[in-house]
Amino acid sequence: AVVPYLIMKTAAMGRGKAKDAYDIYFIIKHYIGGVRELAKEFEPVRDKNIVIEVKDKLAGKFASENHAGPKDVADFMDLEDEESIEMIKRDAYEQVQALLNLI
């Protein structure tokens, strides 16, 4: 039930908990079969209003590597060096964008 989980986590973003963005990133990054397989999970519900709202919210929170979503991911991981922080922020942005482009 990955789609409802991602819907719930996306709805929770904005409550000041960096873990929500991290959980979204983790699921996308580590989904068995990759982001394409994860996107297939959305096929039966891609036109539902709640999924459209999720896409809009994720697109806003992860609009660039410097937006709130990637920043929250890096903050949650409590990284020390700037290079690692920038790499994680970039990866979080790219992972979410890959999913958004497929659903």
Name each model feature, range by range.
Residues A1-K48, I52-S64, A68-L100:
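Catalytic cores of NTP-dependent nucleotidyl/adenyl transfer enzymes across multiple folds
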